[in-house]
């Protein structure tokens, strides 16, 4: 892999974790689109697996080396970006689980009745969408 590409993926990974941490610490307020809230999530995305902190920590600890394995074997930039975003989101939420025993969800979209989420969740979601796009394109 090219050294410049390595730095690009490392930058994306680091930036997503940094933005997640900063937003959770400093962000607050509302505008017409969304509110910044501080909500404790003891489960996973969409409110599933409530009070399964240990399971989610173990799952993340297993998932991260698997992501790294596939990242190192990947030839596609789309796949590498998808895996980078998923890894960053996983680490962002893992940090919360390790330090607080819950994930701090901070974003609430005003016009949707939807669970609160955070930047790590957004990173995971975009990464998962890109992964699906990659898988669909690679089947053709």
Predicted feature residues:
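Alpha-helical transmembrane bundles and membrane-interface segments of multipass inner-membrane proteins
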Residues: 1-140
């Amino acid at each position: 892999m090219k050294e410049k590409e390595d730095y690009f993926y490392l930058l994306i990974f680091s930036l997503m974790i940094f933005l997640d941490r900063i937003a959770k610490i400093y962000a607050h307020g509302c505008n017409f689109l969304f509110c910044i809230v501080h909500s404790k999530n003891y489960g996973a995305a969409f409110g599933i697996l409530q009070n399964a902190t240990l399971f989610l920590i173990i799952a993340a600890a297993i998932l991260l080396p698997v992501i790294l394995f596939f990242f190192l074997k990947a030839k596609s930039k789309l796949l590498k970006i998808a895996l980078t975003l998923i890894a960053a989101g996983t680490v962002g939420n893992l940090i919360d689980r390790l330090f607080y025993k819950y994930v701090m969800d901070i974003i609430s979209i005003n016009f949707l009745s939807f669970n609160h989420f955070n930047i790590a969740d957004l990173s995971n979601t975009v990464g998962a969408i890109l992964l699906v796009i990659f898988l669909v394109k690679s089947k053709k």
